[in-house]
From Swiss-Prot:
<dbReference type="InterPro" id="IPR011831">
    <property type="entry name" value="ADP-Glc_PPase"/>
</dbReference>
<dbReference type="GO" id="GO:0008878">
    <property type="term" value="F:glucose-1-phosphate adenylyltransferase activity"/>
</dbReference>
<dbReference type="InterPro" id="IPR005836">
    <property type="entry name" value="ADP_Glu_pyroP_CS"/>
</dbReference>
<dbReference type="GO" id="GO:0005978">
    <property type="term" value="P:glycogen biosynthetic process"/>
</dbReference>
<dbReference type="GO" id="GO:0043886">
    <property type="term" value="F:structural constituent of carboxysome shell"/>
</dbReference>
<comment type="pathway">
    <text>Glycan biosynthesis; glycogen biosynthesis.</text>
</comment>
<dbReference type="Pfam" id="PF00483">
    <property type="entry name" value="NTP_transferase"/>
</dbReference>
<keyword id="KW-0320">Glycogen biosynthesis</keyword>
<dbReference type="InterPro" id="IPR029044">
    <property type="entry name" value="Nucleotide-diphossugar_trans"/>
</dbReference>
<comment type="similarity">
    <text>Belongs to the bacterial/plant glucose-1-phosphate adenylyltransferase family.</text>
</comment>
<feature type="binding site">
    <location>
        <position position="172"/>
    </location>
    <ligand>
        <name>alpha-D-glucose 1-phosphate</name>
    </ligand>
</feature>
<dbReference type="InterPro" id="IPR005835">
    <property type="entry name" value="NTP_transferase_dom"/>
</dbReference>
<keyword id="KW-0548">Nucleotidyltransferase</keyword>
<keyword id="KW-0067">ATP-binding</keyword>
<protein>
    <recommendedName>
        <fullName>Glucose-1-phosphate adenylyltransferase</fullName>
        <ecNumber>2.7.7.27</ecNumber>
    </recommendedName>
</protein>
<keyword id="KW-0547">Nucleotide-binding</keyword>
<keyword id="KW-0808">Transferase</keyword>
Length: 439
């Protein structure tokens, strides 16, 4: 048995680098006041908790997170959630883009982000770099990914998912030979170019039946690089800014690029619609495609020590409710409510993600706000909300209707406190929606 086949030794010499993304334009306005990895998820987590938890469960504990803008809340979350003991070398550290004399620009892409901090990564005595994305929802054992990389003596290994004819045109596809080596790339091909990218996915371990239904493989944007290979490629292609579109396809002819099949739930949640759908899919019965209820590979986050949720004479169906909520005489269906959510009486919440609050307001504080004609945090009585995302600390008044009654697909109403994306109303963090408002 090779020494690295022991799980602990297998990943000890791996450094994880999580790419937090750019300005988060696809998730705006959820990224207006926070970095993309800090966007709340599933009522109590944040996007960054997914790749960090996968790393910890895979015993990879040297982790950097690269981010671009608004990193204050991300820094705070990381420092409170992942403070490793001083008796081991594990860490999770946020590295924000810096403008220097040598690098006057922000990160220009995935490869550029890594290039700008290569001086720091070089200091670590490791064999591989594990490059991860910060806006995907999945559960993966990276130790098996690294093992495949070493067994095939790959220079770069790409994690891939099998996809069908419907999804393939929207993804970056690749072709492989009989040994699983990647031979060709195509970004979002159509028509004949799409059909030319069909491969026998049974080569990577799919059953014949599944391989027939999923004749394409798509990149997940997750890579293992040999240390020196990454250094050399970033220097060779010094003008290239993106791994998936430039550096990796350009290196295929003279490097051993291997595919590692991931045949489980994986979702890119980097857009408002995908993020919304993935959150509500967690309520699916009897079991969702992705579950946070997995003791063998838990998803970690910051411990908050909140009290249990209180529900008074309410009807709640097909929903997830975070800790510390107060729900009074209302109806909630197919929704996710985040921590400290407060829903007053006679409300109807359907097909909605409510992110909750960062704080509680005492009864006296709420009475004072009411006396001044102001609106308390939470959702006021008699309000109806359907197909929406309510960001944190929103103050929604009484008898408000957030239902997109005109079925508008896209709208920018920042001055009024909301956007509409793909027909989903997104109420901005910290805004106030007046009593009786109809959206």
């Amino acid at each position: 048995m090779c020494c690295w086949q022991s799980r602990g030794l297998l990943v000890k010499r791996v450094l994880a680098i999580i790419l937090g993304g750019g300005a988060g334009t696809r998730l705006y306005p959820l990224t207006k006041l926070r970095a993309k990895p800090a966007v709340p998820l599933a009522g109590k987590y944040r996007l960054i908790d997914i790749p960090v938890s996968n790393c910890i469960n895979s015993e990879i504990v040297k982790i950097y997170v690269l981010t671009q803008f608004n990193s204050a809340s991300l820094n705070r979350h990381i420092s409170r959630a992942y403070n490793f003991s001083g008796f081991q070398e594990g860490f999770v550290e946020v590295l924000a883009a810096q403008q220097t004399k040598d690098n006057p620009d922000w990160f220009q892409g995935t490869a550029d982000a890594v290039r700008q901090y290569l001086w720091l990564f070089r200091e670590w005595d490791v064999d591989e770099y594990l490059i991860l994305s910060g806006d995907h929802l999945y559960r993966m054992d990276y130790a098996q990914f690294v093992k495949r990389h070493r067994e095939t003596n790959a220079d770069i290994t790409l994690s891939v998912v099998p996809v069908d004819d419907r999804k393939a045109p929207e993804l970056g596809l690749m072709k492989i030979d009989a040994q699983g080596r990647i031979t060709d790339f195509s970004e979002k091909p159509q028509g004949e170019a799409l059909r030319a990218m069909q491969v026998d996915t049974s080569v990577l371990g799919l059953s014949a039946e599944k391989a027939k239904l999923n004749p394409y493989i798509a990149s997940m944007g997750i890579y293992v690089f040999k240390k020196e290979v990454l250094h050399n490629l970033l220097e060779k292609y010094e003008g290239a800014t993106d791994f998936g579109k430039e550096i990796i396809p350009d290196s295929a002819s003279d490097h051993n690029l291997q595919a590692y099949l991931f045949d489980d739930y994986w979702e890119d949640i980097g857009t408002i619609e995908a993020f919304y759908e993935a959150n509500l899919a967690l309520t699916k019965q009897p079991s969702p495609d992705f579950s946070f209820y997995n003791e063998k590979a838990p998803i970690y986050t910051r411990g908050r020590y909140l009290p249990p949720t209180k529900m008074l004479n309410s009807t709640v169906t097909e929903s997830m409710i975070g800790e510390g909520c107060m729900i009074k005489q209302c109806r909630i269906h197919h929704s996710v409510l985040g921590i400290r959510s407060r829903i007053e009486s006679d409300c109807t919440i359907e097909d909605t993600l409510v992110m909750g609050n960062d704080f509680y307001e005492s009864s006296s504080e709420r009475d004072t706000l009411k006396a001044r004609g102001e609106i308390a945090a939470g959702i006021g009585s008699g309000t109806t909300i359907r197909r929406a995302i309510i960001d944190k600390n929103a103050r929604i008044g009484k008898n408000v209707m957030i239902v997109n009654k005109e079925n508008v697909q896209e709208a920018n109403r920042e001055e009024l406190g909301f956007y509409i994306r793909n027909g989903i109303v997104v109420v901005i963090k910290n805004v106030t929606i007046a009593d009786g408002t109809v959206i």
